[in-house]
Amino acid sequence: MIRIDAAWLATTPLDMRAGTDTALARVVAVFGAAHPHHAYLFANKRANRLKILVHDGIGIWLAARRLHQGKFIWPLAGGANLALQRPQLDALVMGLPWQRLADGGVITVI
């Protein structure tokens, strides 16, 4: 399993024909650098396809996901890039609503 310590969502669409080098160049342009164990998520304009680039400390992984029905819930283009918590990342990749997930439901004080 690939270790992911942080996940970042880019609001600008990415051409899904982009390969590893093009996606890596976009990560550097948008986020400044590709950090080890960070995942960077991009969607196409229709938000029915998703690409995730992960730097595992040794090399680069690029994964793609396509929804056959519906769309990924994606922020408007041109907005600020977002940091995602692990539950949000898991829900987003499954095509589920993810905005209200984070540490919700966690009780820390009795």
Segments from the language model and where they lie:
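Polybasic/polar functional segments that serve as interface/processing modules
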Residues: 1-110
